[in-house]
């Protein structure tokens, strides 16, 4: 995903951009005119006239324009995104390709935070909570972000119980980033409401091999936790 080109992004975004009501006639005209006036020209005068022809439907003209840009090369696709940002910024911020890039960067950061033993920021915690793909908890209890965890977890058996109670959500990032075997499964400790995974087979029954999960605190007790 980090090697994704502007042409790749345009292929991914085309179904979204050509959806009903996404771009208005005026916005498409402005984008075409900007690409026509760009030096050296992205669109020739003849091409600009073709893509602005009111005899064809807006969707057909837009599909033809995007197909033309994809064939033209990376620079032309990049300038299209620049024009789209200028003339349709709210739509630009919702592009599927931008969402995919944000997911990659933030999950990559989450993996680095966990690998180094640090703790993520509050925005990162909120994002990880929203991206939950697996749930291992008892239903009907409090939200994981509703109350702050104890500043220092107790030690001994009570600490084991507190740590087990700290688990609510399992957020998998294995879909976005391959991880080293040392992070494929493990035991954990908690700090600031975040559960950090360490390489250890004792927790493999809860965390599948080949994926990394981040656990956010709550009062929920998963039945699989600490089972040996």
From Swiss-Prot:
Residues 8-99 form the CARD domain. Keywords: Disulfide bond, Endoplasmic reticulum, Membrane, Mitochondrion, Nucleus, Phosphoprotein, Transmembrane, Transmembrane helix. Expressed in ovary, testis, placenta, skeletal muscle, kidney, lung, heart and liver (at protein level). Expressed in thymus and brain. The keyword Mitochondrion applies. One of its GO terms (biological process) is negative regulation of canonical NF-kappaB signal transduction. GO terms for molecular function: CARD domain binding. GO terms for cellular component: cytosol; endoplasmic reticulum membrane; mitochondrial membrane; mitochondrion; nucleus. Associates with BCL10 by CARD-CARD interaction. Plays a role in inhibiting the effects of BCL10-induced activation of NF-kappa-B. May inhibit the phosphorylation of BCL10 in a CARD-dependent manner. This is Caspase recruitment domain-containing protein 19. It comes from Homo sapiens.
